[in-house]
Amino acid sequence: MSRLQTRFAQLKEQNRAALVTFVTAGDPGYDTSLAILKGLPAAGADVIELGMPFTDPMADGPAIQLANIRALEAKQNLVKTLQMVREFRKDNNDTPLVLMGYFNPIHKYGVPKFIADAKEAGVDGLIVVDMPPEHNGELCDPAQAAGIDFIRLTTPTTDDVRLPTVLNGSSGFVYYVSVAGVTGAGAATLEHVEEAVTRLRRHTDLPISIGFGIRTPEQAAAIARLADGVVVGSALIDHIANASNDQQAIDGVLSLCAALSEGVRNARK
């Protein structure tokens, strides 16, 4: 089994959801970002999404757009992001790590080389928001052939006709974007989320993780009662944006992660 399959299976046995944390690689700089990345599992992150900085992150809200700008100004690129994964894997061979971003940097890097290097570095999955299933042959299929999961986004506007196409070839987990719009936007109602999870379960046996708009341990706990995973990004990144120094950024992200983790772990008790 892959790291993602193993982790979600373990958590299912424990009757709890996964806390999935998102941070942008290289934000606010390489060393601080690596310290945050290495600290997340001990702070309670079950799965980590690591953003690949890009100049035009059109699906992301202001917090993550600014994180991309900070990382790019600190000279972060895909080579350094993969190096960060290698550094992380020196100390951690259990926590699933998913790279999230856009196709352009991967295309520039070269798809075959990227897949080979990502696999060697210890990447478990990819979320590439601008690669629709109609283009599975370009990245999804070769990634999965190499043993890297390809995780799809679904939204409130993905209807029952479109869903099988979107889920075709997806693996690892399904990422349900609970608000139609950009990341970090307001949270959806729990009734809406519950209906969406029920609908998705009719179409897939994959774990369902829900993100966008989750900022507090209470919100995380509410989602953890309904879904297999709770994704938090913008709320963590705000601690980096608002920190007056690097140590404050590290401490802020990891303390919120710990609080969110407690919310998720106690949600079904």
Swiss-Prot record:
Active site positions, chain numbering: 49 (proton acceptor), 60 (proton acceptor)
Enzyme class: lyase
Xref: CDD domains: Tryptophan_synthase_alpha
A Pfam family matched in the record: Trp_syntA
E.C. numbers: 4.2.1.20
Catalytic reactions of this protein: (1S,2R)-1-C-(indol-3-yl)glycerol 3-phosphate + L-serine = D-glyceraldehyde 3-phosphate + L-tryptophan + H2O
NCBIfam families from the UniProt entry: trpA
Subunit structure: Tetramer of two alpha and two beta chains.
Name of the protein in its database record: Tryptophan synthase alpha chain
